[in-house]
């Protein structure tokens, strides 16, 4: 817990303190009082009866002693249960393909009052300009949008080509809570001075981790360097060991990486202060149809029998404490009045949301969205410096009898397996093998890096995207070079987006005009477009639930086992480039 940084975020003047204390004593009229409400006690379990008294942004008092207290306005909760606003401990808003403004409109009415965001997707494409835009959005947002300074731009030096560099000078910005996920864990473990310098610069804040599957002495060394949390755990014993060694565990349930079922059995009354919830990457279709952090809480309660107060604890208070946001996470005197009223606490049915002491109206958020987005001055402009391609760019030569490496996909997981397949005159000995290529898009004029992909389920057609973690070069998979070229040229021509090609034609396309990552459409419109895109993709075969999100991680070298970057095939276990042909 980072009490040392709490002063950075808890801004309240002496005059505000005096007014708050006067309302607490009952000497001054409150701004709001929420009546007919039960407060879920996240510390002891059970419930607290009585009103919630609000002055300005803060809670002045709770409990039956305020039953007759005066207020300028009273809110009848109609028997609802009050819980603290939900907090997402780690996410990339860009992965929702929504702008921060649109993301707030879509998620704040669902009770998501605070996010800890790492904008390293747009930073990898645009550098300082991308981070500055996120900071502007955070400043004007009703939602508490905190930022982590991106630590790895690119994810690993020398493994890929990205669009920009980035400095760490943002650490003193008022919305910055720490250093974002340190993905180069081999570099940290080996004691590379450049990485240790980054960690030293942020030791007064939080140091986020990223170490999927790490164990043994290597995990001990990574934690000894000061890394405080990890959101990449995907196995029960892996998560348990990280908790034992003092690491905080972020339990992730995104659109591609779904680890909640594996890790939820770890959560109990004792370790819940060390457990948090995060989404990492979640698309607007799932947000609209299933929810955000509210969906994760619901599953903890309904599917894993986590007690109510523990489920809501890991969704709020645990995360607030971890990041030193001590003014958040509890419904208690002096805390910021971020309140979610639930008509059904077990089903996480949100009745009303207050943030910073003010009720939220979803229709008002929607009506103001366009003007607020314009006010944030988004960084428009074409970020794709790549000439059109032809089918010959994807031509690979194979020798009968030779064995070739295949990136083997695991549906709904970010990790892959490294497999191999033998080529004959009739093709490969596996009928699920298709082609994959990554094309650098930042003007370096590299030839496409090509490889083989298995287990994805693509039987025909091609998919292309400018969303490919973390450098966001162009990634394409396909059954034919001609359709791969058609899909790639569509996203080049339009300045970025997601494309489905089948039967020699573009079947569906989603434009992403901001950095090739984000749309400026509303959340509802974007969800509808994604629905159409996924429907078109399903015509190509039995693909993963979220084919474009799964495809986007096939180029991220810091997650094992075999990936493809713009510079070639990368062994994520040996942390070294390898060859397509198996020669050893």
UniProtKB/Swiss-Prot annotation:
User: What cofactor does this one take?
Assistant: Mn(2+)
* Enzyme class, UniProt record, top EC level: hydrolase
Q: What keywords would UniProt list here? A: Hydrolase, Manganese
- List each coiled-coil range: none
Q: What domain of life does the UniProt record list for this protein's source?
A: Bacteria
Instruction: Give me the segments passing through the membrane.
Output: none
Q: Indicate what this protein is called per its UniProt record.
A: Adenine deaminase
